[in-house]
Swiss-Prot record:
Keyword Cell inner membrane annotated: no
Protein name: Transcription factor ETV7
Gene Ontology annotations of biological process type: animal organ morphogenesis; cell differentiation; negative regulation of transcription by RNA polymerase II; regulation of transcription by RNA polymerase II; transcription by RNA polymerase II
Tissues of expression: Expressed in hematopoietic tissues.
Gene name for this UniProt entry: ETV7
Domain called PNT: residue spans: 33-117
Species assigned in the record: Homo sapiens (Human)
Record's subcellular location: Nucleus
């Protein structure tokens, strides 16, 4: 490895040949791992946004692109006729069911793309998080060490030098693969020209950090059913002060702030008088449908019983009429005049 290159784990050769059925998957996983820092740039232009924002056409475009890029067997489109939000809900088992020959690879590729999108937001080449000045116990950097021309390329606004070791230690808790590559022992050896080249290649893709972030008002487009709304909030880490996963694999989640969650749901439904009591009545409706259940002996702890893929299928069948009936019944109760005893 030349000095200044980012460390990428090599794929060690193995003496024994894998079973025939694993050749395609092994080759594709190796290609995914070797995408490296430019991986997100390989995607077609429209697909470089967050996967949860993909349209139905984008999902099918991604499917065809993945098949061509990684020589995957052709997958039937009817298994992926959904938007990006629904695609991100699918589990690995759902992918295997819809694409038996390549479901594992497609699932891992989607997770990789989502991870790379997060890395581009707060990665070390875009200045944002690493330029924050926070109190540290490290000695201040002498002025003569920060006046060099390699500190910042003002024409592009990209950081052309690794972050200060003090800042690296302060932000060590962030769970980001892009940050994990920056270790104090390798900061001095990074090739600044390589960093500048990478910043230039990803400049068009990552211009979005300068845009204001969407407000946390609880409004989610095209999301009418309560179970869908709850799941979308769980997928967005900005709403963790209100609701969060306790065990994502087991689909167990906790309502952290009941009143705050009710306000979000009320804002989404344009009902200013929404309370958690009213919202929980609608939530209990899903107990009867075996979609959500309350964890026994636990307060504000719930579990999704059906896989998200199954719920997406049910959304256009019997689930919406039942939801509408339940919502009408709740609204009727809310509108009944109070009678004094």
């Amino acid at each position: 490895m030349q000095e200044g290159e980012l460390a990428i784990s090599p794929i060690s050769p193995v003496a024994a040949m894998p079973p025939l059925g694993t050749h395609v998957q092994a080759r594709c996983e190796a290609q995914i791992n070797l995408l490296g820092e430019g991986g997100i740039c390989k995607l077609p232009g429209r697909l470089r946004i967050q996967p949860a924002l993909w349209s139905r056409e984008d999902v099918l475009h991604w499917l065809r692109w993945a098949e061509q890029e990684y020589s995957l067997p052709c997958t039937a489109e009817h298994g992926f006729e959904m938007n990006g939000r629904a695609l991100c809900i699918l589990t690995k088992d759902d992918f295997r069911h819809r694409a038996p020959s390549s479901g594992d690879v497609l699932y891992e590729l989607l997770q990789y793309i989502k991870t790379q999108r997060r890395a581009l937001v707060c990665g070390p080449f875009f200045g944002g998080i690493f330029r924050l000045k926070t109190p540290t116990q490290h000695s201040p950097v002498p002025p003569e060490e920060v006046t060099g021309p390699s500190q910042m390329d003002t024409r592009r606004g990209h950081l052309l030098q690794p972050p200060d070791p003090g800042l690296t230690s302060n932000f060590g808790h962030l769970d980001d693969p892009g940050l994990a590559r920056w270790t104090p022992g390798k900061e001095e050896s990074l090739n600044l020209c390589h960093c500048a080249e990478l910043g230039c290649r990803t400049q068009g893709v990552c211009s979005f950090p300068a845009m204001p972030q969407a407000p946390i008002d609880g409004r989610i487009a095209d999301c009418r059913l309560l179970w869908d709304y709850v799941y979308q909030l769980l997928l967005d880490t900005r709403y963790e002060p209100y609701i969060k996963w306790e065990d994502k694999d087991a689909k167990i989640f906790r309502v952290v702030d009941p009143n705050g969650l009710a306000r979000l749901w009320g804002n989404h439904k344009n009902r200013v008088n929404m309370t958690y009591e009213k919202m929980s009545r609608a939530l209990r409706h899903y107990y009867k449908l075996n979609i959500i259940k309350k964890e026994p002996g636990q307060k504000l702890l719930f579990r999704f019983l059906k896989t998200p893929g199954k719920m997406v299928q049910d959304k256009h069948s019997h689930l919406e009429p039942l939801e509408s009936q339940e919502q009408d019944r709740i609204e009727f109760k809310d509108k009944r005049p109070e009678i004094s005893p």
